[in-house]
Regions:
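Solvent-exposed alpha-helices and their adjacent loops that cap or buttress functional pockets
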Residues: 55, 79-80, 93, 133-137, ...
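Acidic/histidine-rich catalytic neighborhood of metal-dependent amide-processing enzymes
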Residues: 90, 94-162
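Predominant activation on well-ordered alpha-helical scaffold segments within soluble catalytic domains
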Residues: 6, 29, 99-102, 106, ...
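Acidic/His- and Gly-rich active-site-bordering loop/insert found
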Residues: 1-91
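Short coil/turn motifs at secondary-structure junctions
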Residues: 67-69, 120-122, 170, 234-236
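Metal-dependent amide/peptide-bond hydrolase catalytic core
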Residues: 3, 10-17, 41-43, 147-148, ...
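Residue-level marker for buried hydrophobic side chains located in beta-strands
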Residues: 60-62, 143, 170
Length: 248
């Protein structure tokens, strides 16, 4: 299993790189043929590859993903084992979960069980969401092979909302006539503290400003600024509360 996990980890697969995601499913299928004795089907869902092994109408679904966060080349070496701890991009989330699920499929009735691996989970499952929801409604059980930080059984997870806020200002020369400009950077910075105030630690709701970009040159009043926001919560009520506040 470790050798198979190593092969997957050393095949880097950031969500944004379609060729890399296709390659990691190819590697996964090579491992599948060795472990199961047959290959999975690679289907296309809104232009993205999805690995599907087993029934198209399963009673039980083992749900995984093989895309990762980090851009190619972010880690060296890609694979390291120290004692009983393996490290590398995707080891924890969630290539090890895929390998465990694949080995669990040995000896199972593939007419009743399916193992699915998507390639857009780290960016919100925008293209695979419909597929996941449809197959989940039909199945008796869906087991998501996501690890937890302390090794306990994960029985739920937060929903995620992503926002991008854009401010349009007015450009002007920062030295000659700054008073004629409207500074988009200043205006968007006023929003940050208001966003942070929306979090609710007791209910587990987080609102995190992440990427902010603004300006064009060092001597120009910024005419445009944007801010990305990552919000997560356990309930739809909290997600709606945050959304309403942001849109207000």
């Amino acid at each position: 299993m470790l050798k198979d996990l190593q092969a997957l980890v050393e095949c880097e697969s950031p969500s944004s790189d379609l060729a890399a995601c296709a390659k990691v499913l190819e590697v996964a299928n090579q491992i599948t043929a060795k472990v199961i004795g047959t290959s999975a089907e690679i289907i296309q869902e809104s232009g993205r590859p999805v690995y599907w092994l087993g029934s198209k109408n399963p009673e039980v679904v083992l749900l995984t993903h093989l895309d990762t966060v980090w851009p190619i080349g972010s880690f060296a070496p890609l694979w390291r084992v120290d004692g009983d701890v393996a490290s590398g991009p995707g080891v924890f989330d969630m290539k090890s979960g895929f390998i465990q699920a694949l080995y669990a499929m040995r000896g199972q009735d593939l007419d009743r069980v399916a193992l699915i691996a998507t390639t857009d989970e780290e960016t919100g499952s925008a293209t695979s969401r419909k597929l996941i929801e449809e197959i989940s409604k039909k199945a008796k059980a869906v087991l998501v092979m996501e690890a937890s930080l302390d090794g306990k059984l994960k029985i739920g997870r937060k929903g995620t909302s992503m926002y991008q806020i854009t401010i349009h200002g007015r450009a002007a020369h920062a030295g000659l006539e700054p008073e004629k400009g409207i500074n988009a950077t200043v205006e968007i910075s006023k929003i940050v503290s208001k966003l942070i105030a929306l979090e609710n630690k007791e209910l587990g709701t987080s609102v995190v400003p992440t990427v902010m970009t603004s300006g064009s040159t060092t001597n120009t009043v910024p005419a445009l600024a944007s801010l990305d926001v990552d919000s997560r919560s356990f309930t739809m009520a909290e997600m709606k509360r945050v959304e309403q506040a942001i849109r207000a």
